[in-house]
């Protein structure tokens, strides 16, 4: 064997069903996709052969109609995600939170069909405390033992109902990584230890089972880990952490198969023939300009045809165009439609909803199944929770506090946003937590600070609104389980108390509910419910116009 050699590790994450170079939602060709990743992988395999490993960081089962079709419309066939990973010969994968969200029947079937090992060391059986998935995988490459330790973000109970993860307990990433690094170093005699995390760099929810995004914290505090491949937060980023006399790379290739991370392990052998890692070079590789793998496309041509036929089916029509961008500046048809559907289905008193995408447009005219993935991105269910008037008010206070600034002069920004080095403006916080309410009439005072902005005037029916009264409130399951912390940090409801507040859960996912509503009415007027506004308008209206031009520059 050579005294020095290189090993390549290619890493994808958060693919979200972007398997093919066609966007079934927008009904047009797209960049990225696993079809292009496949070309890149094949080219490097010709050079490196068995010295190349291909791994994935999870969230592969949700996002595009191809996933939905395979998961729920025709689950009798092997899952398309498993078929894609098997075709590309993936070596290891860590499971993601959106994989868990598909439901036990889907993800258990997937784990049984995919040929690579599926990891999550910090997900244990509640009764036995033994790992629910494999904690790690060992790959021997050119005489080198490489250990991959899988970690899943532990804050799943904040987003998903317990029926989706019943019998599982989620442990702190840092402590669990420390345990398994010691194990693979001592028991498995691993030469290289890699963290394969479905967890982002830092930030997010700080739960009672650890931080949502813990890659940097782990790199700083766990001795014996060589580098970390992370994901979940969709942030394209590479960082190097100095800890314990070592430099540890942490890399995230973002989402939707536009990038992958490529790590080159420079290895040497000691006098006894034992492999030793001398250095690592890590880079982010954009694959948007890679050629599409023709053999990949031939293999999956029948699947593509089936999914296009499903996604192109017309289910109704819109009387006007819907744009998510309008939702950030006041009442808008997009949010009003979702509120209408939620109130119609649940007969609740009040509805909460936020736009799930920054800027999508569904034009007036025919509505197809594919449009529903723009209307509603994920397979959330629809919940009804019992809340007091004061809790609703406090929830809205936190929602708008993440969304708007306190204006002190007419020249101030109204939107809570920041400018990037390239001059573009973006939200400072996650827009899918910008909840508005229907069923109540209220004002948002932009001149007042958090805690005193929301003035609820009445129920939209004309009846009085009371802080002490209890109301039935409709919301998606992400919010209803504590996602975005609007129920916990905002409304002040302890996480452990939330299940007792849930009055009903829809058996269908929200996209199915929306489809049934549109098919029933056929023509959707998409009117705007002007039940709330920013005040004082002398401050708010000019600022809204200015900030809208910054966030969405005229073309």
Spell out what each predicted region is.
Residues 1-290, 329-341, 351, 504-506:
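Acidic, metal/ion-coordinating pockets
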Residues 2-8, 12-27, 31-46, 159-174, ...:
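Catalytic centers of hydrolytic enzymes
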């Amino acid at each position: 064997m050579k005294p020095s050699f290189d090993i390549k590790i290619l890493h994808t994450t958060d693919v979200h069903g972007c398997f093919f170079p066609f966007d079934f939602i927008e009904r047009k060709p797209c960049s990225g996709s696993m079809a292009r990743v496949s070309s890149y992988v094949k080219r490097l395999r010709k050079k490196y052969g068995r010295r190349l490993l291909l791994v994935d960081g999870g969230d592969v089962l949700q996002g595009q109609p191809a996933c939905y079709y395979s998961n729920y419309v025709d689950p009798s066939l092997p899952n398309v995600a498993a078929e894609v990973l098997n075709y590309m010969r993936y070596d290891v994968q860590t499971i993601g939170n959106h994989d868990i969200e598909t439901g036990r029947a889907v993800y258990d079937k997937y784990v049984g069909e995919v040929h690579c090992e599926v990891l999550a060391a910090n997900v244990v059986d509640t009764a036995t405390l033994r790992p629910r998935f494999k904690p790690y995988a060992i790959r021997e490459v050119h005489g080198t033992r490489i250990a991959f330790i899988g970690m899943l973000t532990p804050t799943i109970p904040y987003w998903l109902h317990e029926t989706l993860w019943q019998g599982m307990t989620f442990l702190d990433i840092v402590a669990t990584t420390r345990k398994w690094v010691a194990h693979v170093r001592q028991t498995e005699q691993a030469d290289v230890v890699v963290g394969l995390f479905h967890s982002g760099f830092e930030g997010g929810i700080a739960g009672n089972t650890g931080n949502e995004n813990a890659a940097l914290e782990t790199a700083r505090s766990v001795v014996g880990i060589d580098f970390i491949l992370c994901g979940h937060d969709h942030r394209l980023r590479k960082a190097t952490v100095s800890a314990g006399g070592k430099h540890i790379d942490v890399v995230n290739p973002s989402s939707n198969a536009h990038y992958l991370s490529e790590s080159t392990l420079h290895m040497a052998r000691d006098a006894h023939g034992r492999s030793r890692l001398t250095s690592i070079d890590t880079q982010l590789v954009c694959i948007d300009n890679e050629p599409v793998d023709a053999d990949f496309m031939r293999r999956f041509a029948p699947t593509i045809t089936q999914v296009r036929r499903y996604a192109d089916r017309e289910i109704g029509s819109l009387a006007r165009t819907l744009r998510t961008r309008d939702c950030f500046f006041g009442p808008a048809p997009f949010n009003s439609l979702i509120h209408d559907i939620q109130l119609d289905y649940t007969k609740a008193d009040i509805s909460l909803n936020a736009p799930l995408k920054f800027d999508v447009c569904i034009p007036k005219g025919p509505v197809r199944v594919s449009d529903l993935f723009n209307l509603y991105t994920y397979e959330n269910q629809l919940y009804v929770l019992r809340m007091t008037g004061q809790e609703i008010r406090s929830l809205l206070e936190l929602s708008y506090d993440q969304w708007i600034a306190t204006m002190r002069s007419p020249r101030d920004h109204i939107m809570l946003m920041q400018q990037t080095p390239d001059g573009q403006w973006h939200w400072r916080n996650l827009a899918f937590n910008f909840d508005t309410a229907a069923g109540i009439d209220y004002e948002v005072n932009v001149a007042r600070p958090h805690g005193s902005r929301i003035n609820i005037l009445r129920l939209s029916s004309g009846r009085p609104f009371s802080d002490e009264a209890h109301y039935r409130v409709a919301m998606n399951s992400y919010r209803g389980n504590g996602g975005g912390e609007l129920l916990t940090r905002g409304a002040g409801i302890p996480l452990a108390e939330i299940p007792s507040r849930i009055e009903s859960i829809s058996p269908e996912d929200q996209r199915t509910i929306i489809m049934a509503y549109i098919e029933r009415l056929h023509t959707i007027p998409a009117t705007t419910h002007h039940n709330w506004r920013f005040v004082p308008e002398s401050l708010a209206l000019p600022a809204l116009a200015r900030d809208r031009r910054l966030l969405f520059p005229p073309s």
